[in-house]
């Protein structure tokens, strides 16, 4: 936990009163602990260094991005994943090297593709066969692409954040031949060069079982089809702790288990291990952040519920309404033990605009 109470009973982060931050910047405000973010990044670096494999870490900017965050990512020697023109623009405005930027997304627009080409990004992560044609059409020089494959593996997480199952909207199915079709299609283009293979099976993954299973499927497919690549990106989705009972992904142990499985599988297949890439986002910033709200009205329905309404809602905090995510709520201005259970509600005109149930 990155927050604690000081002697005055005020909640603090990094020694700074969150009450003071709320008064200075207003609410809702999202506040991050920079030291915690850097520490998480360095844990990933050390875990991969211990594996002995060639690796790269890309920050998934959809987790949280702004110019200062991009600069921090640059300082910590990470690459950057973007999924929109806006995220790419932010990265470029921060002075981030475009060659270290990768463009994701299952439905990139022509404008986004052209913008990325104009700024000579590192590579595109291709999600559909049609996208191969689009990139090749607008390119006027060689472009690296990484194919996102669908391994047909269900991660043990909420159905809304599973992305590797057979009926997912993401990726090129290995089982149904789309992945191999994409490899051959890239080879037949004028400008595209196949740099690597990518997979991502979901979010809030606490263990390594599904990730290892997927890595083995992909390596077996690569070896059986004699596809040589310089990058194997195993995605992200590493889980974090939101409330008591949640388990954070064990970075050191988890990376060790995954990389050892990759080594053993590749050796058995006599397949050369390419550079291994990962894309943590939430697991870098999620436990380092807190959202500040100001309490407004309080509605007590005797024997039914007590609603404490705040000055934000599902417009800035969608996860509770979207798939029942759970959160912990703390008072900023006093350290008192809870003596009742309430529902923290947003201010939007939706009955589902709830931030925390049973706070």
Regions found by a protein language model. Give the residues of each.
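Short clusters of hydrophobic/aromatic residues that line enzyme substrate/ligand-binding pockets
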Residues: 3-5, 11, 170, 344, ...
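Solvent-exposed alpha-helices and their adjacent loops that cap or buttress functional pockets
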Residues: 93-96, 117-118, 137-141, 162-164, ...
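A cross-family glycoside hydrolase active-site/sugar-binding cleft signature
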Residues: 58-60, 81-83, 102-104, 125-127, ...
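Active-site-proximal loop/turn and secondary-structure-junction residues that shape catalytic pockets
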Residues: 63-65, 86-87, 107-109, 128-130, ...
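Charged (often Lys/Glu-rich) extended helix/loop segments that serve as interaction or gating elements
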Residues: 271-359
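Active-site loop/helix belt of alpha/beta enzymes
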Residues: 152-297
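A charged N-terminal "starter" segment
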Residues: 1-124, 129-144, 180, 184-193, ...
């Amino acid at each position: 936990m990155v927050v604690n109470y000081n002697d005055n009973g005020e909640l603090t982060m990094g020694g700074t009163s969150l009450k003071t931050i709320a008064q200075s910047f207003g609410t809702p405000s999202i506040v991050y602990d920079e030291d915690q973010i850097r520490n998480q990044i360095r844990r990933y670096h050390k875990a991969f260094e211990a594996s002995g494999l060639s690796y790269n870490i890309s920050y998934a900017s959809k987790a949280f991005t702004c110019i200062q965050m991009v600069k921090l990512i640059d300082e910590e020697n990470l690459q950057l994943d973007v999924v929109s023109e806006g995220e790419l623009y932010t990265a470029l405005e921060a002075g981030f090297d475009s060659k270290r930027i990768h463009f994701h997304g299952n439905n990139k627009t022509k404008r986004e593709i052209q913008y990325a080409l104009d700024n000579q990004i590192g590579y595109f992560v291709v999600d559909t066969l049609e996208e191969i044609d689009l990139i090749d059409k607008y390119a006027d020089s060689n472009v690296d692409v990484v194919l996102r494959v669908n391994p047909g593996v269900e991660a043990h997480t909420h159905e809304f954040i599973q992305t590797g199952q057979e009926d997912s909207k993401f990726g090129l199915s290995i089982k149904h031949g789309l992945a191999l079709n994409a490899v051959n299609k890239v080879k037949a283009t004028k400008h595209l060069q196949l740099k690597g293979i990518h997979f991502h099976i979901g979010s809030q993954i606490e263990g390594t079982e599904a990730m290892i299973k997927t890595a083995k499927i992909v390596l077996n497919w690569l070896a059986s089809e004699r596809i040589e690549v310089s990058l194997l990106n195993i995605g992200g989705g590493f889980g974090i702790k939101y409330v008591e009972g949640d388990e954070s992904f064990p970075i050191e142990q988890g990376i060790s288990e995954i990389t050892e499985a990759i080594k053993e599988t590749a050796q058995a297949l006599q397949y050369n291990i390419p550079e291994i890439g990962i894309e943590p986002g939430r697991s870098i910033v999620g436990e380092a952040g807190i959202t500040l709200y100001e309490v407004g009205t309080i509605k007590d329905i005797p024997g039914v519920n007590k609603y404490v309404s705040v000055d934000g809602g599902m417009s800035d905090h969608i996860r509770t309404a979207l798939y029942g995510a759970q959160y912990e709520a703390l008072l900023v201005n006093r350290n008192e033990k809870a003596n009742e259970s309430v529902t923290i509600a947003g201010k939007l005109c939706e009955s589902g605009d709830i931030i925390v149930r049973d706070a």
